[in-house]
Structures are given as C-alpha cells and as structure tokens.
Amino acid sequence: MEYSTFGKHIIVDLWGVDFSLLDDMYFLEHHLVHAADLSGAHVLNVSTKEFDPHGVTVLVLLSESHLSIHTYPEKNFAAIDCYTCGTTVEPQIAIDYIVSILKPNEMHIKKLIRGIGEIVNTD
C-alpha cells in the first residue's frame, strides 16, 4: 500500500481558559480522546503528565499522527497541536470541539499543509 505524505497541521494558542479546566488531567484526557474520535482519527495510545505545582500535558497518539495539549493554568493558557496525515481525518473538528469545551477568551490559530514540498500556511 502506498501512503500520501499530505497532512494537515493545526496549532492553537488559547488564552483566558479557566484554571481548574487546565489543571485537570483526567478531564483533558477524556476530551482530547473524544475530539480525536469525532475527527475520524484512530487512537493508538494516550500519554499524560501532571506537573508540580500546576500544568498538564496530554498526548494522544493517532494512527494518523497526534493531538496534544500543554497547559499553563497559572497563566490561563493552553497550547494545542493537531497533525493528521492523509485525507481521511479532519483535525479542525477536533480543534473546534476542544475550543468549545475550554471556552477561551482569546484564540490564535495557524493552519498548515505539510508533505507537499514547502510547508503551506493556509491562513
């Protein structure tokens, strides 16, 4: 079987997110896995890490690549990264779901197309 190198990569910075949501590893793990499912991705594994005194990293390893979040609750900030290879998964669905759950006051997003030569910014 031949695979395409084409991929969609979305990176998002969220500001003004509630501290308690960003410091809850189980809440974030549940919602990132659900977001991946909604996007059509296939979850292979989930890795989580709580930091002292605050902060969480959740990495969802996908058959199609990955979805991750790194949080800084004391700054009400989260960094989200979703990269999917091929054309069968829509990472924007995962991002939209996570944003709807976290309800940031401010959001900055970059969308990239990868694997076609030069990285293309779609904004």
Swiss-Prot record:
SUPFAM superfamilies noted in UniProt:
S-adenosylmethionine decarboxylase
Enzyme Commission code(s) on record: 4.1.1.50
**GO MF assignments:** adenosylmethionine decarboxylase activity
* Catalyzed chemical reaction(s): S-adenosyl-L-methionine + H(+) = S-adenosyl 3-(methylsulfanyl)propylamine + CO2
Q: Gene3D superfamilies attached here?
A: 3.30.160.750, S-adenosylmethionine decarboxylase domain
Keyword Transmembrane helix part of the UniProt annotation: no
Q: Which UniProt keywords apply?
A: Autocatalytic cleavage, Decarboxylase, Lyase, Polyamine biosynthesis, Pyruvate, S-adenosyl-L-methionine, Schiff base, Spermidine biosynthesis, Zymogen
Q: Which GO biological process categories is it annotated with?
A: spermidine biosynthetic process
Q: How is it modified after translation?
A: Is synthesized initially as an inactive proenzyme. Formation of the active enzyme involves a self-maturation process in which the active site pyruvoyl group is generated from an internal serine residue via an autocatalytic post-translational modification. Two non-identical subunits are generated from the proenzyme in this reaction, and the pyruvate is formed at the N-terminus of the alpha chain, which is derived from the carboxyl end of the proenzyme.
* Pathway participation: Amine and polyamine biosynthesis; S-adenosylmethioninamine biosynthesis; S-adenosylmethioninamine from S-adenosyl-L-methionine: step 1/1
S-S bonds: none
Q: What general EC class does the enzyme of this chain belong to? A: lyase
User: Entry's InterPro entries?
Assistant: AdoMetDC_C, AdoMetDC_fam_prok, AdoMetDC_N, S-AdoMet_deCO2ase_core, S-AdoMet_deCOase_pro-enz
Q: Which GO terms describe its cellular component?
A: cytosol
Record PTM Pyruvic acid (Ser), positions in chain: S65
Cofactor descriptive note:
Binds 1 pyruvoyl group covalently per subunit.
* Annotated site residues (Cleavage (non-hydrolytic)) in this chain: E64, S65
Cofactor(s) named in the record: pyruvate
Task: Tell me the PANTHER family matching this sequence.
Answer: S-ADENOSYLMETHIONINE DECARBOXYLASE PROENZYME
Family per similarity comment: Belongs to the prokaryotic AdoMetDC family. Type 1 subfamily.
Role noted for this protein: Catalyzes the decarboxylation of S-adenosylmethionine to S-adenosylmethioninamine (dcAdoMet), the propylamine donor required for the synthesis of the polyamines spermine and spermidine from the diamine putrescine.
Could you describe the subunit structure of this protein? Heterotetramer of two alpha and two beta chains arranged as a dimer of alpha/beta heterodimers.
Spell out the HAMAP family in the cross-references: AdoMetDC_1 (MF_00464)
The identity of this protein, by name, is: S-adenosylmethionine decarboxylase proenzyme 2
Species = Bacillus cereus (strain ZK / E33L)
Taxonomic lineage of the native organism: Bacteria, Bacillati, Bacillota, Bacilli, Bacillales
Q: Which gene encodes it?
A: speH2
